[in-house]
Regions:
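GNAT-family acyltransferases
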Residues: 1-88, 151-163
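Conserved G/P- and acidic residue-centered "switch" motifs that form tight phosphate/ATP-binding loops
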Residues: 61, 93, 123, 149
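Conserved GNAT acetyl-CoA-binding A-motif
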Residues: 108-118
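Positions that flank functional sites
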Residues: 29, 121-122, 145
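Conserved catalytic-core motifs of GNAT/GCN5-like acyltransferases
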Residues: 116-118, 136-153
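Amphipathic alpha-helical segments that line or abut small-molecule/effector binding pockets
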Residues: 8-11, 37, 96-108
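Conserved acetyl-CoA-binding loop-helix of GNAT-fold acetyltransferases
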Residues: 84-85, 91-105, 124-132
Length: 163
């Protein structure tokens, strides 16, 4: 789990990947150490309230990315998964493995019914993860996210709990 004490390392990772992440993530272009610390405090609160969590992806003792649940709708028994990975560590299956573990947690530990993932239409690497894991493409949310001065269309993927 990511915790406030990870702020420096996580921020340095964002700094190294800022140009890459800023193409897809609305927060990346101007993320600060203070903003990273505030995000980690928020995710600790969510975890304490049983309303999601953020996990670190660690490779060779270093944080190389993050993946987690930004919240849980306990009435609908649904959640979404968000993720990002250091550009140098892509293409190794790390994020697919992490997202698979999160999906298993959502269905097996939380007994949820539905998991969603959204990815920018043009972000093929991000889209490949839900596609590999059997998520169903459910539609396009046109100009659904503003990143810098442009709007991105997002593909919505959904996966239902096995029956």
């Amino acid at each position: 789990m990511l915790e406030e004490r990870d702020a420096d390392e996580l921020y340095r990772l964002v700094e190294r990947n800022r140009a890459y992440l800023a193409r897809w993530m609305p927060w990346a272009a101007d993320q600060t150490l203070e903003g990273t610390t505030a995000f980690l405090r928020m995710t600790e609160r969510r975890r304490a309230e049983n309303n999601g969590f953020e996990a670190a992806l660690v490779c060779e003792g270093r944080i190389v990315g993050a993946a987690g649940f930004p919240g849980v709708d306990w009435v609908a028994r649904a959640t979404s998964i968000g993720y990002w990975l250091d550009e140098e560590h892509q293409g190794r299956g790390l994020m697919t493995q992490a997202v698979r573990a999160l999906v298993d947690h959502a269905f097996d530990e939380w007994d949820l019914h539905r998991v969603e993932i959204q990815a920018a239409v043009d972000n093929q690497r991000s889209r490949a993860i839900p596609e590999r894991l059997g998520f169903v493409e459910e539609g396009i949310r046109r100009e659904a996210e503003r990143v810098g001065e442009r709007y991105l269309d997002l593909v919505l993927y959904g996966l239902l709990a096995p029956t």
